[in-house]
Amino acid sequence: SVSINKNIPVFGGLGGGTGNAASILKVLLKGKISKSLLNKAESIIGTDLRLFFWNQGFLSNLKNITYFRKKKLFFILVKPNIRCSTKEIYSKVRKYSKKQLLSQNKINTKNKFINVISQENNDLQSIVEKKYPIIKKLLIAIRDEKGCCFSRMTGSGSVCYGLFKDQITAKKALNKLKIKFPSFWFSFAKTV
């Protein structure tokens, strides 16, 4: 029996439940799974299970991510009052963009790292923006906050985030956004 206490919002695109399930499956199945079992598990657990099982998330192509964990970055996370269906959003993707190969040798400063990740995109974001215009409005509001390096939607939505280099600036932006969007869920996070 496994019990998970989830302290993040459901339907946020943060992959909490699915990511935890994938980790447990990986251990139980010793990292090996047939395509048919994976398809069956996805129908029960979540459409994005294979991304977590095969470590296909953002920055997964870096061999040693420890270096990047030392870079102190700060995030504000905002979830509007909408529920994005992961299955529905993924079903509308026609083509995934090719991810760039990242070299730790070329990304050796915080600014270079931020520049590289700001060039990446979320293939699901435009789909969600069309269905829920508030996502685009929220992303613009976050991006326009002083000190925000860039804003983006997480996973299949609906949580949006902004990346900041400075904790004080990020917290000020968070407080301003809470006034603009009082009914939304908010959180502050930092790299560990």
What are the roles of these predicted feature ranges?
Residues 1-12, 29-36, 75, 79-82:
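ATP-binding N-lobe of GHMP and related small-molecule kinases
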Residues 12-41, 51:
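DPxDG-like acidic metal-binding loop motif
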Residues 16-17, 153-158:
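Glycine-rich beta-strand-to-loop/alpha-helix junction loops that act as flexible
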Residues 52-150, 165-178, 183, 187-192:
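Conserved, helical-rich catalytic subdomain that frames metal- and/or nucleotide-binding sites
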